[in-house]
């Protein structure tokens, strides 16, 4: 597997993406070849959060001109990641038949996101 820093390039900050932070949705520009599973693992590793859902969108590069010269902007991929903002404790049975409860082991927001709430 590739390093998480190679998969997540940078946050994608717009008015809409900033509004979605309140709902636990964070938007990133990711490597164009990254899969949803790789994106999930990279976000969980980099930010110590629990990822519930990953949506991706592929964008084609736009055609740009400078006088008679023509070129293309690169293709890119956007990932919208929904994190668990209210983790519930998990209860399970131990070997002795007793019940044990785990507390949350991960964060409920990404403070390093840039223009956070």
Swiss-Prot record:
InterPro entries: Nucleotide-bd_a/b_plait_sf, Ribosomal_uL23-like, Ribosomal_uL23/eL15/eS24_sf. One of the early assembly proteins it binds 23S rRNA. One of the proteins that surrounds the polypeptide exit tunnel on the outside of the ribosome. Forms the main docking site for trigger factor binding to the ribosome. Part of the 50S ribosomal subunit. Contacts protein L29, and trigger factor when it is bound to the ribosome. The keyword Membrane does not apply. The keyword Membrane does not apply. Keywords: Ribonucleoprotein, Ribosomal protein, RNA-binding, rRNA-binding. GO terms for molecular function: rRNA binding; structural constituent of ribosome. HAMAP family: Ribosomal_uL23_B. It comes from Acetivibrio thermocellus (strain ATCC 27405 / DSM 1237 / JCM 9322 / NBRC 103400 / NCIMB 10682 / NRRL B-4536 / VPI 7372). One of its GO terms (cellular component) is ribosome. This is Large ribosomal subunit protein uL23. Gene3D superfamilies: 3.30.70.330. Signal peptide: none annotated.
């Amino acid at each position: 597997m590739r390093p998480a820093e190679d998969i997540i390039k940078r946050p994608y900050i717009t008015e809409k993406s900033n509004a979605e932070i309140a709902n636990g949705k964070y938007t990133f520009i990711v490597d164009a070849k990254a899969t949803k599973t790789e994106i999930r693992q990279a976000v969980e590793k980099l930010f110590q959060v629990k990822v519930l859902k990953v949506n991706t969108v592929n964008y084609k590069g736009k055609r740009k001109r400078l006088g008679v010269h023509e070129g293309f902007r690169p293709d890119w991929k956007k990932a919208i990641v929904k994190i668990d903002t209210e983790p519930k404790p998990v209860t399970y049975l131990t070997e002795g038949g007793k019940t044990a409860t785990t507390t949350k082991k991960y964060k409920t927001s990404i403070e390093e996101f840039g223009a956070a709430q």
